[in-house]
C-alpha cells in the first residue's frame, strides 16, 4: 500500500501544471532553483511547479567569438 501511495504522488507531481523539467531550463540557459531566484535573475518558468523554479539571468551572458 505504501508503494502505491508513492507511485500516485510521483505521477501527480509529474502531471501538475505546465512544468518543463530541468532539461528544458538548462537548454534555455536557465538554472533550476528551489524557493526563490537569486538577485539578478528572474522567474522564466517552472522546472517542477510550484516548488522548483527555472531562473534566468536578467542580462544575457556574452558569448566568445
Curated annotation (Swiss-Prot):
Belongs to the beta-defensin family. Has bactericidal activity. GO terms for biological process: defense response to bacterium. Disulfide bonds join 25-54, 32-47, 37-55. This is Gallinacin-12. Residues 1-19 form the signal peptide. The keyword Disulfide bond applies. It is found in: Secreted; Cytoplasmic granule. Changing residue 27 to R: In strain: Taihe silkies. Induction: Induced in the theca layer of the F3 stage ovarian follicle by intravenous injection of LPS. Repressed in the granulosa layer of the F3 stage ovarian follicle by intravenous injection of LPS. It comes from the Eukaryota. Keywords: Antibiotic, Antimicrobial, Defensin, Disulfide bond, Secreted, Signal. Expressed in the large intestine, kidney liver, gall bladder, testis, ovary and male and female reproductive tracts. Expressed in the ovarian stroma and the theca and granulosa layers of the ovarian follicle. Its main location: secreted. GO terms for cellular component: extracellular region.
Amino acid at each position: 500500500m505504501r508503494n502505491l501511495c508513492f507511485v500516485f504522488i510521483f505521477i501527480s507531481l509529474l502531471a501538475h501544471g505546465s512544468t518543463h523539467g530541468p532539461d528544458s531550463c538548462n537548454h534555455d540557459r536557465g538554472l533550476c532553483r528551489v524557493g526563490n531566484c537569486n538577485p539578478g535573475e528572474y522567474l522564466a518558468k517552472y522546472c517542477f511547479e510550484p516548488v522548483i523554479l527555472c531562473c534566468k539571468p536578467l542580462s544575457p551572458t556574452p558569448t566568445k567569438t
